[in-house]
């Protein structure tokens, strides 16, 4: 994904810079708007490979996940969530936040490749 458009592009660039491949392969890169577009490039045969989130790669069983990028080669990936405000008016939002932090939802996230 394009580092100017998508977080996945930023993480990909960090990995490629850390391995020394960013500059040596720069003229061969094709940037997609996002991870889904990158996966579609691979599915359509327009590119040979793409760097995508494992969670997205797992949604395309016909594609081969070739390798996992080492975690120490890019910034930590997080998906923040927040409930704005408090009180009775926002009880549903607070309940949802508690649900997201529950062990049950952690198991569901892990089953889809999130850690």
Regions found by a protein language model. Name each.
Residues 1-115:
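Exported/periplasmic ABC-transporter solute-binding proteins
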């Amino acid at each position: 994904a394009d580092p100017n458009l998508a977080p996945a592009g930023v993480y990909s660039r960090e990995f490629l810079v850390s391995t020394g491949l960013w500059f040596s392969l720069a003229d061969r890169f094709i940037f997609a708007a996002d991870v889904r577009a990158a996966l579609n490039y691979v599915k359509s045969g327009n590119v040979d490979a793409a760097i995508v989130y494992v969670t997205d790669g797992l949604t395309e069983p016909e594609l081969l996940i070739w390798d996992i990028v080492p975690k120490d080669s890019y910034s930590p990936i997080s998906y923040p969530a927040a409930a704005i405000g408090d009180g009775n008016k926002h009880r549903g939002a607070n309940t949802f936040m508690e649900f997201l932090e529950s062990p049950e939802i952690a198991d569901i996230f892990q089953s889809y490749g999130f850690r």
